[in-house]
């Protein structure tokens, strides 16, 4: 799988290109008098060291780029790597089935759960089919239908957040985009089952919040959560999207910053270089966090669960 190196990773890309070149030469002619294995190993160690150095001092804008990485794991990738017996459920029973939201029943270590998440696409056709991960009102109404089903059957709800934002098209507005988001916020705040939310990529404004009200809210290390994109903020404040790096720093969109502000509960570490480098490793870390969160919530009765969730919402903004 291509790593699709970002701009700030170019020194790493150059080293990896040298490694690939030497490896290819070694495979083509095994009779070479020069032993390339030691040189390849040296370069690999240097690449790891350089990656560790670069990733130890990332800015908010660089993290935003990682959150949007084209090879980053999406909701369906985590479903495949963490859960078993997934059965997708479709449609909002009112208008259509929005492919930007996926959801269904699955098992987490044998325990039945309801999973709901944003889904982006990788190839052009899939991106269009998924509307680039931007749900329409019917997507949020589908999500709510599944949440209400989970409440009826006493299933914990697990959501995965990864969207640039709710779709802002005319049709979406005509079908009640803001109403759908607002209704989800209200209903999620009073569902009588545990809700664990995790930002796995972009957490874009109301489009993220519509499946983001929970008893536990986590973020992957290189994910972001914000009321507007850095480019959008820069365009408003500085009249230029070129100021996006400055806006990203000012907005405090990173997982560690939001943890400091008590907006989220946990930051889930990613493999060196980001989640796209090792799907299996990030799945193991995320699964462990989900199991720990559900264990914490299982000891609460319905009244305690709702009171705690209410207090959580009321405390937002107080550090």
UniProtKB/Swiss-Prot annotation:
Q: Which NCBIfam families match?
A: accA (TIGR00513), AccA_sub (NF041504), PRK05724.1 (NF004344)
> What is the organism field in this record?
Yersinia pestis
Where is this protein chiefly located? cytoplasm
Q: Name one GO cellular component term.
A: acetyl-CoA carboxylase complex
Source taxon at top rank: Bacteria
Nucleotide-binding keyword on record: yes
Name this polypeptide is given: Acetyl-coenzyme A carboxylase carboxyl transferase subunit alpha
What GO molecular function annotations does the UniProt record carry, in alphabetical order? acetyl-CoA carboxylase activity; ATP binding; carboxyl- or carbamoyltransferase activity
Compartments reported by the entry: Cytoplasm
The enzyme's E.C. designation: 2.1.3.15
- Name the gene that codes for it: accA
Pathway terms, separated by semicolons: Lipid metabolism; malonyl-CoA biosynthesis; malonyl-CoA from acetyl-CoA: step 1/1
Q: State whether it acts alone or in a complex, and with which partners, per the record.
A: Acetyl-CoA carboxylase is a heterohexamer composed of biotin carboxyl carrier protein (AccB), biotin carboxylase (AccC) and two subunits each of ACCase subunit alpha (AccA) and ACCase subunit beta (AccD).
């Amino acid at each position: 799988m291509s790593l699709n190196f970002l701009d700030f990773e170019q020194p790493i890309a150059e080293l990896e290109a040298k490694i690939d070149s030497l490896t290819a030469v070694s495979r083509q002619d095994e009779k070479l008098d020069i032993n390339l294995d030691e040189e390849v190993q040296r370069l690999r160690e240097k690449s790891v060291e350089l990656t560790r150095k670069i990733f130890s001092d990332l800015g908010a804008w660089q993290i935003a780029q990682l959150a949007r990485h084209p090879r980053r794991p999406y909701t369906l990738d985590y479903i495949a790597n963490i859960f078993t017996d997934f059965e997708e459920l479709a449609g909002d029973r009112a208008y259509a089935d929005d492919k930007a939201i996926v959801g269904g029943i699955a098992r987490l270590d044998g325990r039945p759960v309801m999973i709901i998440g944003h889904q982006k696409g990788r190839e052009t056709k899939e991106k269009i089919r998924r509307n680039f991960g931007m749900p329409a009102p019917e997507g949020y109404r589908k999500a709510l239908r599944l949440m209400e089903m989970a409440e009826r059957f006493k299933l914990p709800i697990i959501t995965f957040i990864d969207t640039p934002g709710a779709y802002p098209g005319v049709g979406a507005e005509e079908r009640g985009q803001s109403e759908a988001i607002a209704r989800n916020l209200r209903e999620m705040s009073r569902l009588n089952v545990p809700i664990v939310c995790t930002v796995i990529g972009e957490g874009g404004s109301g489009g993220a919040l519509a499946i983001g009200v929970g008893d536990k809210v986590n973020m992957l290390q290189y994910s972001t959560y914000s009321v507007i994109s850095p480019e959008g903020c820069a365009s408003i404040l500085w009249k230029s999207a070129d100021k996006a790096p400055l806006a990203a720093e000012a907005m405090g969109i990173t997982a560690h910053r939001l943890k400091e502000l008590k907006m989220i509960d946990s930051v889930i570490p990613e493999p060196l270089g980001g989640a796209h480098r090792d799907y299996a490793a990030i799945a193991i870390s995320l699964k462990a966090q989900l199991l720990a969160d559900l264990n914490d919530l299982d000891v609460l009765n319905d009244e305690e669960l709702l009171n705690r969730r209410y207090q959580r919402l009321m405390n937002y903004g107080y550090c």
